Amino acid sequence: EKPYKKIFGEFEGRHAATSAESETGDVKYHLGFAATRNVGGRDVRVSLIPNPSHLEFANPVLQGVARARQTILGGDGERDEATVVPISIHGDAAFPGEGVVAETFNMSRLRGYRVGGTLHIIANNQVGFTTDPNDGRSTHYSSDLAKGFEVPIVHVNAEDANTCIRVMQLGVEYRAKFGKDFLVDLVGYRRHGHNETDEPAFTQPAMYTQIRSHPSPRELWGERLVKEGTLAADEIQKLDEEIAANYERIQSSSSASDGEGEGPGEAVKAQDEAATATL
């Protein structure tokens, strides 16, 4: 995971690299990142490619990166599709609205471009910046485009953490067995604005009246744990206070160069090296 020190530091303008070559002109949450995680005793390399404000443009780039790395890791010029699993996270308005999404799906099973399946997640907050779904698409579901490519689609309540985990496990198993794309429509909502300067109640007043009176996922999960007898209410409150205090401590001492992991420069460099090795 990306250390909180790095995240807080970048939001406050303290970047590890300050040279002109390192400036992207884009927002900080579009920067790439790479790190190694230990999962079940095995190291897994996780890379987030830079995804610019050109909506969905990163999708074909991700396919190329995945295919190149599959070739490198496969050895002897043979691709091993099990070594690299691409994951695309889409917006519910951008998914049907940007043509590059359909173009990338069309290449997904072509022998010159296939990567053995991509896991797609639509972060469906039921609003596209300030556009309601009925003004942004001609289909019922934001995921309907994928039906034309016979991609399995699962709609899941984003507030149900256990079900979300099970659905992703299903997607991983499907991809491993059939080598094809799998899509999860993660239906939730956006509690705050599109970005730091957007006040959503100006354009969606009725929607945000409901959202602001609705318990957060953390509150709902806490209520569930209390009901199940897993934790007591005072234990949850204590955890909340400890986490908030920890955030404050980290933020007060953060800089973008703190913590482990690689920033956008290293992530891009790694992708360049992968592409060069493949060529």
Where are these regions (language model features)?
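Conserved internal helical-beta-strand scaffold that buttresses enzyme catalytic cores
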Residues: 1-87, 93-101, 105-118, 124-138, ...
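Conserved phosphate-handling catalytic cores of large alpha/beta enzymes
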Residues: 128-139, 147-193, 197, 201
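Active-site-proximal loop->helix
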Residues: 144
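A mobile, often basic/glycine-rich helix-loop segment
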Residues: 203-205
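Hydrophobic side chains in beta-strands
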Residues: 122-123, 186
